[in-house]
Design a protein with these regions (language model features):
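Intrinsically disordered, low-complexity segments
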Residues: 1-3, 20, 353
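Bacterial N-terminal signal peptides that target proteins for export
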Residues: 1-9, 884
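Eukaryotic scaffold repeat domains enriched in small/polar residues
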Residues: 22-893
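Bacterial N-terminal signal peptides
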Residues: 7-18
Length: 893
């Protein structure tokens, strides 16, 4: 059994260092007894040592009809009611179900469990061939294909480097790094926690997962080469060079190669010399070519804007540096004569991504350099001294590559055929010269191409791999970029399209951002962060894109109610309706309005669509956190009849809000005129409602005096990214803070909780549960104070237990309603951890470390059997099965 819960016995550690409360051998010292007393049933039992317990009433089908109690016994904090302090318990049942209805359909049973543990269940939605839009690809000297994936919808990005065989079969993931590397292997990228036996990646961004290089969550570095001698080289903005080993570790002192910059200046812009200033904002593409022996790196494409022009960088400049020598920057190799108003910048020759007189570059075995000269419609060839030695006629050349053995030259010619679309032709030449003519060509490409090319040689077979390219019969929207790689085999005098092992599922989920579970059906809903939702069977893993009438059902977010209905923020846009639907997506009207639509919700986007969450109570009340003005948030509510709930807060402010009141085309009694909770910080995420009607909201704030878990006390990411789930009573509340607009107390008698933020208290708050992350915003790893679109999603079960994901600790913590830690599971692992390739006959995973792998867990969902974790970086859901150290069942007689 793969067990993932950390179990210790010291309760002080449990409460203050973030470790679970159970420890040692847990057993019943008094097994459960069930005694009927008039209209109640008494359940008594006792346990041997401090541990968590769970008490439930089961129906004749062994389904839970009443979640009676769950919590930690023997902790410093008292357990949540109806449990009492101490290891001996007596819990009464009033004969009703969770919703207060009498339970009459017997026979009935009581189940008591102690000592929750967790074990790996399964993966859902994963695909080794889906890892973001490809930003670069190369072939290594081992013949394998190294592919860097990155982009997702609406700025959701996570850098991934995967390795594939020459035939396109998935082999392994190198970035993010494997979990089984030896301590010390990751240098500045991650620290080894010897006590936890786990890696702790450094987190550089709260917007997107980024362990390696800080660019506000955008991994701007691209793969240059892969070899046994140099490992995998990357180049980033302004020529910064990076390296990892072929095992995924960091072979040098750091990920960044210090003292070398693949750029005409080794100075940091803007504190720079004239060249760095001139290229700080440049035009043209940035194209690199590396020599087959890995010694030389060449650059072509960039040139200064007119207002930054300098004689030191003539138009058409080509640069070069020695990678294995003392060079600290690139120097000019040659200058291709070019005109600033040439055909390269006009319709037909212009590229919409970036255009210049000089585009692609490549180096052959002799050190000759091949450059795409779009100004003169040719590929020009220089020797290793920078002397022009030949050319190849080619209209609009964009990309060039040289066969590493035969010296054959492959040229992509690219043409603008409309707004932001480009057609292309591939030509093969056996040599250069003014009279050179293609010996093979291929033109059956889709009309929209953004090509990258890598030449792979496997014995006598030569394959050309393309990213951003599709065949002419591909069913793509006008500006849709292809997800699959495209492969051509060089057959000598012709190219032949090849269908190889590399193939993502046509309808596979590309990004994983938000999650909601359906405990009644053991299903899980996962958003791509924009407007697509996928539904999966938790037991089988089967499922896919949510559809209605055969077409994609667009929705940024949803919650599953206690009644099993779906409460959906629907539509294609980041603003749109909040409505109630059946499991089959049919409307369910409200009695007071005769409509299933509650309201039009004012939203926004940044890193995906900025959906803050929907919550549904047992009585059918619905809550949504949204904006009443840009980046100003509140929680509103609607009753089970569909009418707005009256709150105490923001009454005057909301009635002057355009998106909430003045622009709403509804009768006044249907308009939202007050906040149940508000205002709240813009850094918020997730809403849940318990069986008593209490509201739980995720906020980027921590309790007063909060101390991070051991090892994270000085981690700037933990302190900045991590917030708390705040429990408010049914009456709601507000965040009271001097720096929060429209903050005002409306109930001086309401309970208040102090926070670790000076001058900030939470009115109406009953409890805080710290440890949930990420919350994006300003500060370390953030962008601006309004860049708050990346949020975590906690969950709450019917026992009142909370599951709190944290991307910094790469774990999920389960706590009872009093805040006692029950269990914590998950350790760092990349995609390969516990992944079993379908081609693996022995059924063993690529990497068996750790037991429950998580890379950047942003959300969770409870069911009766499991906790489902949305692992954003690994692009999958991890099902974690819940088990117990002991369980007893008794009949109710």
């Amino acid at each position: 059994m793969r067990s993932g819960c950390i179990l210790v016995g010291a309760l002080f550690l449990a409460l203050f260092l973030g470790l679970p409360a159970s420890g040692g051998d847990v057993a019943f010292t008094q097994k459960p007894m069930v005694v009927k007393q008039a209209d109640k049933t008494a359940i008594t039992f006792a346990v041997s040592t401090p541990t968590d317990v769970e008490v439930a009433v089961l129906d004749k089908d062994d389904k839970v009809v009443r979640h009676l109690a769950a919590g930690v016994l023997g902790a410093n904090r008292n357990p949540p009611e109806p449990l009492q302090p101490g290891l001996s318990q007596s819990v009464a049942w009033d004969g009703k179900d969770d919703l207060g209805k009498p339970v009459t359909d017997g026979p009935l049973k009581v189940r008591v469990r102690i000592g929750m543990t967790a074990k790996f269940g399964r993966f859902i939605g994963q695909d080794p061939y889906i890892f973001g839009g490809v930003d670069s690809l190369v072939t290594g000297d081992d013949g394998n294909l190294y592919v860097s994936g990155f982009s997702g919808p609406a700025n959701e990005c996570q850098k991934t480097l995967r390795v594939f065989s020459p035939e396109g079969k998935f082999l392994k993931t190198l970035l993010p790094f494997p979990a089984d590397l030896p301590a010390g292997a990751m240098k500045d990228v991650a620290r080894w926690d010897e006590e936890a036996k786990a890696w702790r990646p450094r987190n550089l961004s709260n917007l997107n997962p980024d362990f390696y290089e800080s660019s506000n969550g955008y991994g701007l570095y691209k793969v240059l080469s892969a070899s046994k001698q140099q490992g995998v080289l990357f180049v980033g903005a302004a020529g910064k060079l990076y390296r990892i080993g072929l095992d995924g570790g960091i072979p040098g002192p750091a990920f960044l190669i210090a003292g070398k910059r693949a750029w005409p200046s080794d100075k940091e812009w803007p504190k720079a010399d004239e060249i760095a200033q001139a290229l700080g904002y440049h035009q043209g593409p940035v194209r690199y070519g590396i020599s087959p022996d890995g010694k030389w790196l060449c650059l072509s494409g960039p040139f200064p804007t007119k207002d930054r022009a300098t004689p030191q960088i003539p138009l058409g400049s080509i640069w070069r540096m020695r990678l294995d020598g003392p060079d600290t920057k690139m120097t000019t190799l040659a200058v291709v004569p070019a005109t600033p108003d040439g055909t390269w910048g006009k319709e037909g020759g212009k590229n919409y991504d970036s255009s210049g007189p000089i585009h692609g570059i490549a180096v052959d075995l002799k050190g000759n350099v091949y450059v795409c000269d779009r100004d003169k419609d040719r590929v020009v060839v220089f020797d290793d001294a920078g002397k022009e030695i030949g050319e190849i006629p080619a209209k609009n050349p964009d990309v060039v590559a040289v066969h590493p053995k035969t010296g054959a030259i492959y040229v992509i010619r690219r043409f603008c055929n409309g707004w932001n679309t480009h057609s292309m032709v591939l030509d093969k030449f056996n040599g250069y010269g003014k009279d050179a003519r293609p010996v093979a060509s291929f033109a059956k490409f889709h009309r929209n191409n953004w090509p990258q090319m890598a030449v792979a040689v496997n014995g006598a077979r030569t394959l050309l791999w393309f990213a951003g390219v599709a065949a002419d019969d591909a069913k793509l929207a006008t500006h849709e970029q292809p997800r699959k790689l495209f492969v051509l085999e060089d057959k000598g005098n012709e190219f032949q399209a090849v269908d190889l092992a590399f193939g993502p599922q046509s309808d596979g989920q590309a990004d994983f951002a938000r999650i909601a579970s359906d405990p009644l059906r053991e299903e899980v809903y996962v958003s791509n962060g924009e407007n697509l939702i996928y539904r999966y069977d938790g037991d089988t893993g089967e499922g896919g894109l949510l559809r209605k009438d055969g077409k994609p059902f667009f929705a940024p977010d949803l919650a599953v109610g206690y009644d099993g209905l779906l409460y959906v923020r629907s539509g294609q846009g980041y603003s749109g309706p909040l409505e109630r639907l059946t499991h089959d997506l049919a409307p369910v009207p409200y009695p007071a309005t005769d409509s299933n639509k509650l309201y039009d919700i004012y939203g926004r986007y940044g890193i995906g669509f900025c959906e803050k969450g929907v919550g549904v109570g047992p009585d059918g009340k619905v809550y949504e956190c949204w904006m009443y003005d840009f980046a100003k948030y509140f929680v509103s509510g609607w009753g089970p009849d569909g009418m707005p709930l009256a709150g105490k807060y923001l009454t005057q402010k909301l009635k002057s809000s355009k998106p909430v009141w003045t622009d709403v085309k509804l009768p006044e009694d249907r308009r939202v005129g007050s906040a149940i909770i508000g205002p709240v910080f813009s850094e918020n995420g997730g809403i849940r409602v318990d069986l008593k009607g209490n509201l739980y909201v995720g906020l980027r704030v921590q309790p007063q005096g909060y101390v991070p878990p051991a090892g994270f006390e000085k981690d700037p990411a933990y302190g900045s990214f991590t917030g708390s789930v705040v429990k408010f009573g049914p009456e709601g509340g507000a965040v009271l803070a001097a720096d929060l607009a429209d903050s005002k107390s409306e109930d001086p008698k309401a309970p208040r909780l102090p926070t670790n933020k000076a001058g900030t208290v939470l009115e109406g708050a009953l409890m805080m549960y710290p440890g949930v992350a990420p919350f994006s915003g300003s500060g370390f790893g953030g962008n601006t104070s309004c860049c708050v679109c990346r949020v975590s999603r906690f969950d709450l079960d019917r026992y009142g237990r909370l599951a709190l994901p944290n991307v910094v600790s790469t774990s999920v913590r389960v706590v009872d309603n009093a805040g006692n830690v029950i269990c914590e599971f998950g350790k760092y692992g990349n995609f390969d951890s516990q992944y079993v390739s379908p081609d693996n006959a022995d059924g063993k995973p690529i990497n068996a470390t750790p037991d429950i792998p998580l890379c950047w867990p942003t959300g969770v969902g409870f069911t009766e059997k499991a906790i489902y974790v949305c692992d954003t970086y690994n692009r999958r859901v991890v099902r974690v099965d819940l088990t117990w150290k002991a369980e007893e069942i008794r009949d109710i007689k």
